[in-house]
From Swiss-Prot:
Organism for this UniProt entry: Rickettsia prowazekii (strain Madrid E)
Catalytic activity: DNA(n) + a 2'-deoxyribonucleoside 5'-triphosphate = DNA(n+1) + diphosphate
EC number in record: 2.7.7.7
Name of this protein: DNA polymerase III subunit epsilon
Annotated positions binding a divalent metal cation 2: 10
Keywords, alphabetical: DNA replication, DNA-directed DNA polymerase, Exonuclease, Hydrolase, Magnesium, Manganese, Metal-binding, Nuclease, Nucleotidyltransferase, Transferase
Binding site for substrate: 10, 12, 55, 60, 161
Cofactor note: Binds 2 divalent metal cations. Magnesium or manganese.
Amino acid sequence: MSSLREIILDTETTGLDPQQGHRIVEIGAIEMVNKVLTGKHFHFYINPERDMPFEAYKIHGISGEFLKDKPLFKTIANDFLKFIADSTLIIHNAPFDIKFLNHELSLLKRTEIKFLELTNTIDTLVMARNMFPGARYSLDALCKRFKVDNSGRQLHGALKDAALLAEVYVALTGGRQSTFKMINKPDEINNLAVKCVDVQQIKRGIVVKPTKEELQKHKEFIDKILIQA
């Protein structure tokens, strides 16, 4: 039986439009197979090679000073592309993130890299609009609707928002996942552990539903990462 691999993804940026020089400063992505979180994720803070506007800082709390010693996008691009390969991306307001990711990829000037396509993306914002016409569709509003604990979300953050979105997405599609412990600010450690997926194993269809022990280890792993801040 083939496995359904989905990547719940979020980014934080310096602004709203990459055509005005804005860049990605954080990527958070979490793997889900057959609607079960596997414990594999990808998380990096990224040096945008520019200043951090105060308006953006107020949203996510990531300062230019904090990002000075973080890697450039070009140094993590290959690992990121490997992590999301052969999967459907789950994103809230997908055009925004895809626009920024494709801009970052275009700056690499590598002809072998294919741009990301919205056709391979599920937009939870669109899902929510179709399911609940006239309601509020922000991530916070959907957390409230589905009773997902977002009490620690004073600031935006790519990894913690991806964790929240994972629960919201499962609720939107008829199921639930265990609750994650959220953080209040970005961690002050240079790029906490990144556990990338074995893409070849996924291709061979070897991925199976995690055991109870694996799920517990996953929860402890995510909690450890999110508590660091």
